[in-house]
Design a protein with these regions (language model features):
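Bacterial Sec-dependent N-terminal signal peptides
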Residues: 1-24
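Residues in and immediately flanking transmembrane alpha helices
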Residues: 15-16, 214, 471, 475
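Repeated scaffold domains used in trafficking and secretory/extracellular systems
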Residues: 222-224, 287
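Short glycine/serine- and small hydrophobic-enriched flexible loop segments
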Residues: 227-228, 291
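Beta-rich accessory regions
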Residues: 233, 261-274, 278-286, 290-501
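Beta-rich carbohydrate-recognition and catalytic domains
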Residues: 20-171, 175-221, 230-280, 295-299, ...
Length: 501
C-alpha cells in the first residue's frame, strides 16, 4: 500500500487537474463569469458603500436557461468580482406554479421613500424586477434589503405594477430629483413600446407616457434604460434611451439607442436618419447602467451580457458555466454633424490590474509583422496609419490556420471583425460571422483597443466611437498576434500590450 500511495495520489491529483482544466479552457480571467451554471442579463447594477453590485439572471440548477433567480457578485474596483450566494431565488406560489425573478434593477432608497427601512436609515436597497409566471403573467414586483443586498424580503403586496399581460418586463428605475420621484422605464416587448411610470414610494406607479414603434423592430424589445448622459466638451447632458432588440444583421440581437430630451414625463428623441446601435458585435445585450454611482464617476457606467440568444444555449464553454459579462464601460455622448452619438470606454480601473508586456512606436510594416508576444489574455492598444496600404489587419488568437481577423479597408472605410476561422464555429449554424462597420480615419489614423480574455473580445474603435463584442473559441491556443499591410506600407504609430494580473 505504501508503495502505491504516491501513484494513487498522483493519479487523483491529475484527475482533479484534468477535470478542472478542460472546462476552464475558455474561462475568462478578468470578465465576470459565475463559477458555475447559466447566466444572462445583468440586473440591479448598483453602488453602495464602496461596493459595486452585479446581480444577474441566474439558473442555480444548471447551465441552460431556467429557474431564473438573481445571482449576485460584488466588486470594490469594478475589476475583481466576488461571487455571493443567490440573492433572489425563484419561489413557489400557493397554486403550485413558480414565480421566476426576471430582469430588473436595484436602487438605493436613501430617503426611505418606500418606508421599508428604519427611520433615518439611508442605505436601504430596493430591487425592482419582473415577476414571471411561465405562460401566465409578467408583472413588476419589489424586494428590499437592509444589509447591502445580502438578504432580501419580498414586499407582501406584490406585484406593484400589473397590466394583466404575459409580456411586460424589465423595469429600470431612476431617481428624478426635479420632481422628487422615481421614474420607471419598462417594455411591452411584443409591441415595441417602452413605457414610463412615476412613483413616490416605489410601490404605487402611474403611467406618464409611452415611446415606441420606431427604430429597430426586427426583434422584440427588452431591457430598457433611460439615462442622463453628459455631452463631451460641454456642460450639457442629453437623455439616452437604450433598448435591447435586433441587430444590424437580421435575426441576431443587439442594443439600439435613442438620444433625446426627457422632461419628467415624455421622452422626445432627436431626429435620426439611421438606427443607432450600442455595440456592433453579436454578443452584447441587455446592458443597463449602474444606479447610485458616487460623484467621482463623471460618466454613467454599464455592464452587458456577452451572448446572443440565437446561439447562447450552445456556446462550447464546457459543462460548468455558460455566459459572461462585459467589463464595466463608461459612456458619454459626442456631438457630430449627424447628431449625438454614444462613445464608450472600459472604465479606467481596469488599468490598475495591468502590467505592460510590450510597447513599440513608429514601426513601418510591409507585409506581415509578427508581434513578439503571445497570449489570450491582454489589453492591446494600437494606433495605425494605413499610409499607402490598401488594407491593414490585426490578427489575434492566431495558430496554424486559425485566427480572428480585424480588417480595415481604406477605400471603403470598412472595419470588419471576422470570426469565421476563429476556432470552434460549427456548434451552431449562425455563429460563424463577420461584422462590418463604417469607420472613417481620423487625421489618417485608425485607433483600436482590444480587450481579449480567453474567449471574449471587446473591441473599441476610434476611442470608443464604435464597439464590437464577440465570443470566439480558439482550438489551438497558440495566441499569436500579427499585423499586416496589403498593397503598400503602413505605419504603427504606437502599440502597447498589457497583461492582466
Ligand atoms: C433578456 C430577457 C429579459 C428577461 C430575461 C429572462 O435577455 O429575455 O427580457 O427578463 O431575459 O431571463
Amino acid at each position: 500500500m505504501k508503495k502505491i500511495a504516491p501513484f494513487l495520489s498522483f493519479f487523483l491529483f491529475s484527475l482533479v487537474c484534468f477535470s478542472q482544466t478542460i472546462p476552464q479552457e475558455y474561462r475568462p480571467q478578468y470578465h465576470y463569469t459565475a463559477p458555475k451554471n447559466w447566466v444572462n442579463d445583468p440586473n440591479g447594477l448598483v453602488y453602495l458603500d464602496g461596493e459595486y453590485h452585479l446581480f444577474y439572471q441566474y439558473n442555480p440548477f444548471g447551465n441552460v436557461w431556467g429557474h431564473m433567480s438573481w445571482g449576485h457578485a460584488v466588486s470594490k474596483d469594478l475589476n475583481r468580482w466576488e461571487t455571493l450566494p443567490v440573492a433572489l431565488p425563484e419561489f413557489d406560489n400557493p397554486d403550485g406554479t413558480q414565480t421566476m425573478i426576471f430582469s430588473g434593477c436595484a436602487v438605493i432608497d436613501s430617503l426611505n421613500t418606500s418606508g421599508f427601512f428604519e427611520k433615518g436609515f439611508t442605505k436601504g436597497m430596493v430591487a425592482v424586477f419582473t415577476s414571471h409566471i411561465e405562460g401566465k403573467a409578467q408583472h413588476q414586483s419589489i424586494a428590499y434589503s437592509a444589509d447591502k443586498g445580502r438578504t432580501w424580503k419580498r414586499y407582501d403586496k406584490n406585484p406593484v405594477l400589473d397590466l394583466g399581460m404575459k409580456d411586460f418586463r424589465d423595469p429600470n428605475v431612476i431617481w428624478y430629483p426635479e420632481k422628487q420621484v422615481w421614474i420607471m422605464t419598462v417594455v411591452k416587448p411584443l409591441e415595441y413600446t417602452a413605457q414610463f411610470y412615476e412613483s413616490k414610494d416605489l410601490k404605487t406607479w402611474s403611467l406618464l407616457s409611452e415611446f415606441g414603434k420606431q427604430g429597430d423592430m426586427t426583434k422584440i424589445w427588452e431591457c430598457p434604460s433611460l439615462t442622463k448622459v453628459p455631452v463631451e466638451g460641454s456642460n450639457e447632458s442629453k437623455w439616452v434611451l437604450m433598448i435591447s432588440s435586433g441587430h444590424r444583421q437580421k435575426n441576431y440581437l443587439a442594443m439600439q439607442y435613442f438620444v433625446g430630451d426627457f422632461d419628467g414625463k415624455t421622452f422626445t428623441p432627436q431626429k435620426q436618419n439611421e438606427i443607432l446601435y450600442v455595440d456592433e458585435g453579436k454578443d452584447f445585450y441587455a446592458a443597463i447602467p449602474f444606479s447610485n454611482l458616487p460623484k467621482s464617476h463623471t460618466k454613467p457606467i454599464m455592464i452587458g451580457w456577452i451572448n446572443d440568444w440565437e446561439y447562447a444555449r450552445e456556446i462550447p464553454t464546457g459543462d460548468t458555466w455558460r455566459g459572461g459579462f462585459s467589463v464595466a464601460r463608461e459612456f458619454s455622448l459626442k456631438k457630430t454633424a449627424e447628431g449625438f452619438r454614444l462613445v464608450q470606454q472600459p472604465v479606467a480601473q481596469l488599468k490598475s490590474a495591468q502590467k505592460e508586456a510590450f510597447r513599440i512606436k513608429n514601426k513601418v510594416i510591409d507585409g506581415v509583422y509578427n508581434l513578439p508576444f503571445k497570449g489570450e489574455v491582454f489589453d492591446l492598444e494600437v494606433e495605425l496609419r494605413p499610409h499607402r496600404a490598401k488594407v491593414v489587419t490585426l490578427n489575434v488568437f492566431q495558430s496554424q490556420g486559425e485566427a480572428t481577423v480585424i480588417r480595415y479597408d481604406v477605400a471603403t472605410q470598412e472595419l470588419s471583425l471576422d470570426r469565421t476561422k476563429s476556432g470552434q464555429v460549427n456548434f451552431h449554424p449562425r455563429f460563424s460571422s463577420v461584422e462590418r462597420v463604417k469607420v472613417p480615419l481620423k487625421e489618417g489614423k485608425l485607433s483600436l483597443r482590444l480587450l481579449a480574455d480567453k474567449s471574449i473580445l471587446e473591441l473599441f474603435v476610434q476611442n470608443g466611437e464604435q464597439a464590437l463584442t464577440e465570443w470566439v473559441f480558439p482550438i489551438q491556443h497558440e495566441g499569436e498576434i500579427s499585423l499586416t499591410s496589403e498593397g503598400g506600407k503602413a505605419n504603427i504609430s504606437a502599440l502597447s500590450i498589457h497583461t492582466i494580473r
